[in-house]
């Protein structure tokens, strides 16, 4: 989302939404990008004009120095467009506010995870980590083995079903779709004054987005320019010429 051209993003929305409409009869209104290394401030405008109403991400919590102060907020783009945004806050519960398990060097008290395992500690941790408790009483926890495949396991589903019946000391669990969650979040955002983040969503942890494999990225950009020029001149030729 940092390097991709605006036209490419528009086409991805166009064909992605077309696929869901034709194959599933659904109009997709959520941009779900858990594992992306930062977001251009142009994205809210593109989302809004492509019929996207909500945005979810996770990895932005990996920032090395500056913690983004919101988890549920309006993201404002360079033209003033605002998109309702939610960061997944799932992580294990901590008694001392420090983090916690996994053993990964980037793991801190800020780090969250979209590959949830839906056990009581993670449910408690998701609520503990959430920063807009005074405005919203619901958080989103996605579970299953992602970032390589596998999805939800039978024991994860069984654990989720048991937690839904209630577990002492654990926030109430409800199994539902992301669409249902965001509909409720939109209702809450209309009733409460959600905070606003204006501009780029910058990820500090992976800083080589623009510079690593620079020749590949330069070639990709040349290809994007060439495709746009080809389409433009092809359209003009079809409109005014005998082609």
What are these regions (language model features)?
Residues 1-243:
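Catalytic-domain carbohydrate-binding cleft regions of carbohydrate-active enzymes
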């Amino acid at each position: 989302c940092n390097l991709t051209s605006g036209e490419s993003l528009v086409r991805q929305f166009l064909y992605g939404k077309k696929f869901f409409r034709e194959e599933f009869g659904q109009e997709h209104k959520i941009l779900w990008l858990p594992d992306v290394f930062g977001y251009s401030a142009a994205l809210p405008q593109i989302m809004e004009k492509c019929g996207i109403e909500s945005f979810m991400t996770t990895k932005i919590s990996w920032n090395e120095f500056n913690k983004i102060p919101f988890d549920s907020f309006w993201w404002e783009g360079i033209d003033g467009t605002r998109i309702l945004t939610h960061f997944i806050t799932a992580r294990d519960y901590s008694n001392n506010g420090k983090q916690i398990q996994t053993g990964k060097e980037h793991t801190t008290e800020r780090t969250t995870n979209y590959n949830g395992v839906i056990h009581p500690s993670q449910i408690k941790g998701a609520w503990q980590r959430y920063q807009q408790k005074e405005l919203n009483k619901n958080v989103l926890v996605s579970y299953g083995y992602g970032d390589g495949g596998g999805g939800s396991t039978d024991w994860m589903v069984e654990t989720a079903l048991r937690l839904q019946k209630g577990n002492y000391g654990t926030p109430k669990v409800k199994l539902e779709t992301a669409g249902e969650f965001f509909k409720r979040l939109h209702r809450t955002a209309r009733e409460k004054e959600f905070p606003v983040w204006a501009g780029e969503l910058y990820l500090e942890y992976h800083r080589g987005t623009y510079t690593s494999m620079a020749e590949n990225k330069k070639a990709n950009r040349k290809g994007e320019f060439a495709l746009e020029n080809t389409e433009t001149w092809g359209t003009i030729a079809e409109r005014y010429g005998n082609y």
